[in-house]
């Protein structure tokens, strides 16, 4: 099985050449590309030709070093960004541009977060929240088909939000019932709601298409390294094997760039080895 890690764990902004090289040397196969999840990014101001050229260059660099852009991380929800129809339409336009970028990167999995029309951690109106997300996905499906991308809806860490739990994301995806719409399981987010991560995996089954792997104590979205929180890793790996998951075991955690050398290099290498050993247990 492939193993991967987030772009920011090794790369900074447009400085990715050395990052991809190190990523591969430490043992990773894939990257979760996140250098486009800021609405204020200068990349969105590029012409169509320059936009395409930029991401094709990133892809060429990754491929040169043996790294596949397995999945892409979309815009993270922000307070008051999805409250009005105008706000949601603007965000949808960003999603559409990102899906196009995914194609140029050779990326097949586009991870997106549900709309939060009442705020990040506010219950609001369940039916309305659910419906605006159904509408969002239906708008994005034609673009996913055009650019050969699968939309992977991510579960969230907000306790009071109606579409945060794995079960609710599953319901959303089943309501759409389209082969281009699947789920990205964020293990840390799921652990905030339940310690039974294996049941979440089994519930998702064939709808599981991507992973964000990290740990926490069940209290907050801490993005700890595996085995540094309370997530039941053995049960998770067993369940992934049971459902036949054969995608990328992708970390959404990293060794801090502030860690002094040579310890940073040693810890990065060790983390990659640990990740590989975990992926090998998924049978």
Regions found by a protein language model. Name each.
Residues 1-6, 70-81, 116-120:
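N-terminal small/glycine-rich loop or linker at the start of catalytic domains
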Residues 44-49, 85-88, 126-128, 223-228:
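Short glycine-enriched, charge-decorated loop/helix-capping segments at active-site entrances
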Residues 1-4, 9, 13-29, 92, ...:
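Histidine-acidic metal/acid-base catalytic patches
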Residues 39-44, 78-83, 118-124, 192-193, ...:
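A short acidic, helix-capping loop that chelates divalent metal ions and anchors anionic groups
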Residues 9-11, 35-37, 75-78, 114-118, ...:
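Active-site-proximal loop/turn and secondary-structure-junction residues that shape catalytic pockets
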């Amino acid at each position: 099985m492939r193993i991967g890690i987030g772009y920011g764990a090794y790369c900074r902004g447009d400085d990715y050449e050395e990052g991809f090289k190190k990523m591969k040397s430490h043992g990773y196969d894939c990257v979760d590309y996140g250098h486009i999840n800021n609405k204020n990014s200068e990349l969105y101001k590029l012409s169509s030709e320059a936009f395409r050229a930029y991401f094709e260059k990133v892809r060429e660099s990754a491929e040169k070093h043996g790294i596949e852009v397995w999945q892409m991380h979309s815009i993270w929800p922000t307070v008051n960004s999805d409250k009005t129809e105008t706000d949601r339409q603007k965000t949808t336009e960003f999603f559409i541009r990102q899906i196009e970028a995914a194609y140029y990167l050779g990326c097949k999995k586009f991870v997106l977060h549900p709309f939060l029309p009442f705020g990040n951690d506010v219950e609001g109106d369940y039916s309305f929240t659910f419906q605006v997300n159904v509408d969002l996905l239906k708008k994005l499906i034609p673009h996913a088909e055009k650019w050969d991308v699968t939309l992977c809806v991510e579960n969230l860490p907000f306790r009071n939000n109606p579409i945060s739990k794995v079960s609710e994301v599953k319901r959303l995806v089943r309501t759409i019932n389209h082969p281009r719409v699947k789920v990205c399981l964020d293990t840390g987010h799921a652990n905030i709601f339940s310690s039974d991560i294996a049941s979440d995996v089994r519930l998702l089954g064939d709808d599981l298409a991507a992973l964000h792997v990290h740990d926490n104590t069940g209290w907050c979205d801490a993005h700890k390294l595996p085995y540094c929180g309370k997530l039941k890793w053995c049960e998770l790996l067993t369940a992934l094997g049971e459902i036949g998951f054969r995608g990328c075991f992708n970390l959404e955690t990293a060794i801090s760039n502030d860690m002094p050398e040579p310890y940073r290099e040693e810890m990065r290498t060790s983390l990659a080895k640990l990740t590989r050993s975990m992926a090998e247990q998924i049978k």
